[in-house]
């Protein structure tokens, strides 16, 4: 190096370690000079082999430029100065969310409040429907209508249509506990066809399922309102008894049963009282009740109808494809004629569900004898039952034998069997 410029490198004490360091510093210094020379203009080139500059530069400015960071580029200084700087576009900065916060994104579809209200309404209606179905099952189990139907089919002979209509009306009414009007069943037919027997079976069944005999009222016209008694007293007594029964049933949330036998003997004042009890203007606990009227009114019309249409009646134990239509047409005619006849007597039968009981055929009377014999302790022998049935009077029409008195004389005939062994011993 030139002696006029003292070296900035420290003097090495030994040639062993300092020599490589000096070489590195020398190379670094050379690289810096070459970078600076490339950036200078052509007239201000430094002297070759030395670190001095030309007349336009000095060592102080070179060191000041070396201290600032420079970036290497292949463009010359004139090209860099001639370029116009481009205006950079400002990019939209990406919004960064903290990891601990919740990212709230805009909703693509905004649900209206009406849709939410509709969904809530559908849920409420579905819940009410399920609750109603459960109530239907509870009422059916409480009153054991299946057991009642089996008991009626087993004990009532010759009246399948009447039993089916009674059970259909009871199932429809007892499906719910709240009603808008009471149920009035009017069982009509001639003597001995099983009306009173059905009334006793209904009363026995409801006493068992309700577990309270006070909720079943049986009213007999001849017994509770005999001829010398004033009619107004009977009317007040009937109204009070009905009010007590329905009030107790309302407190226990049950449906009471009120059976009125021999309704054809009831005075008009009592029929008026019953008609008032069935009105919708009454208190709501009067609506939750079942009334059963057992009446012989219309028995003559039913007898004439059966005898005139005996040829259209199906024989027993026969089930054909057209049996439904064959049975429905006469039954509808009979119901229409009975309703017109009874409505002329009193307006009570306008709201009643009329159930006609037809005449009993001879095989049905034989079954009545066997049933009574078994109940009295006798062996229900078929031949003996047929022999007893031969002693009754019948209508002989179109190959059928209809009992004139039905099963009314069965009890008396069976009671006579107890004296036959005594007569045989003589």
From Swiss-Prot:
Its main location: membrane. GO terms for cellular component: cytoplasm; endomembrane system; intracellular membrane-bounded organelle; membrane. Residues 48-60 have a biased composition (Low complexity). GO terms for molecular function: ATP binding; ATP hydrolysis activity. The modification Phosphothreonine is found at residue 84. Keywords: ATP-binding, Membrane, Nucleotide-binding, Phosphoprotein, Transmembrane, Transmembrane helix. The keyword Transmembrane applies. It is a single-pass membrane protein. The modification Phosphoserine is found at residues 58, 76, 101. Residues 41-60 are annotated as: Disordered. SUPFAM superfamilies: P-loop containing nucleoside triphosphate hydrolases. ATP binds at residues 189-196. Gene3D superfamilies: P-loop containing nucleotide triphosphate hydrolases. The keyword Nucleotide-binding applies. It is found in: Membrane. The chain crosses the membrane at residues 117-133. Coiled coil: none annotated. InterPro entries: AAA+_ATPase, ClpA/B, P-loop_NTPase, Torsin. Belongs to the ClpA/ClpB family. Torsin subfamily. This is Torsin-4A. It comes from Mus musculus. The lineage of its organism: Eukaryota, Metazoa, Chordata, Craniata, Vertebrata. The gene is Tor4a.
């Amino acid at each position: 190096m030139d002696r006029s410029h003292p070296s900035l490198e420290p003097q090495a004490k030994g040639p062993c370690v300092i020599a490589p360091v000096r070489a590195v510093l020398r190379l670094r210094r050379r690289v810096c000079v070459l970078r600076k020379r490339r950036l200078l203009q052509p007239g201000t080139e430094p002297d070759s082999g030395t670190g001095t500059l030309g007349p336009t530069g000095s060592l102080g400015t070179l060191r000041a430029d070396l201290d600032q960071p420079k970036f290497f580029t292949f463009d010359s200084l004139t090209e860099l100065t001639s370029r116009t700087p481009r205006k950079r576009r400002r990019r939209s900065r990406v919004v960064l969310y903290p990891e601990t916060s919740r990212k709230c994104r805009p909703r693509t579809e905004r649900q209206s409040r009406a849709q939410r209200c509709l969904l809530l309404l559908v849920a409420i209606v579905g819940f009410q429907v399920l609750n109603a179905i459960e109530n239907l099952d509870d009422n059916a189990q409480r009153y054991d209508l299946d057991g009642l139907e089996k008991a009626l089919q087993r004990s009532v002979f010759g009246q399948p249509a009447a039993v089916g209509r009674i059970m259909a009306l009871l199932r429809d009414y007892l499906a719910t506990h709240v009603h808008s009007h009471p149920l009035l069943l009017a069982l009509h037919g001639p003597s001995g066809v099983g009306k009173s027997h059905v009334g006793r079976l209904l009363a026995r069944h409801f006493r068992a399922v309700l577990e309270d005999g006070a909720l079943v009222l049986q009213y007999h016209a001849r017994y509770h309102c005999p001829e010398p008694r004033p009619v107004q007293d009977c009317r007040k007594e009937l109204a009070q008894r009905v009010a007590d029964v329905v009030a107790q049933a309302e407190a226990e949330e049950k449906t009471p049963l009120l059976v009125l036998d021999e309704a054809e003997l009831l005075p008009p004042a009592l029929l008026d009282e019953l008609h008032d009890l069935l009105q919708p203007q009454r208190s709501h606990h009067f609506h939750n009740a079942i009334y059963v009227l057992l009446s012989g009114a219309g028995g003559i019309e039913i007898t004439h109808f059966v005898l005139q249409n005996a040829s259209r009646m199906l024989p027993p134990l026969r089930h054909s494809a057209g049996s439904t239509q064959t049975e429905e047409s006469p039954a509808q005619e009979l119901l229409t004629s009975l309703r017109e006849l009874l409505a002329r007597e009193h307006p009570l039968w306008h709201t009643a569900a009329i159930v006609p009981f037809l005449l009993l055929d001879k095989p049905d009377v034989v079954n009545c004898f066997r049933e009574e014999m078994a109940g009295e302790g006798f062996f229900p022998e078929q031949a003996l039952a047929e022999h007893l049935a031969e002693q009754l009077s019948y209508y002989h029409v179109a190959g059928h034998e209809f009992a004139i008195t039905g099963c009314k004389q069965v009890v008396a005939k069976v009671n006579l069997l107890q004296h036959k062994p005594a007569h045989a011993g003589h």
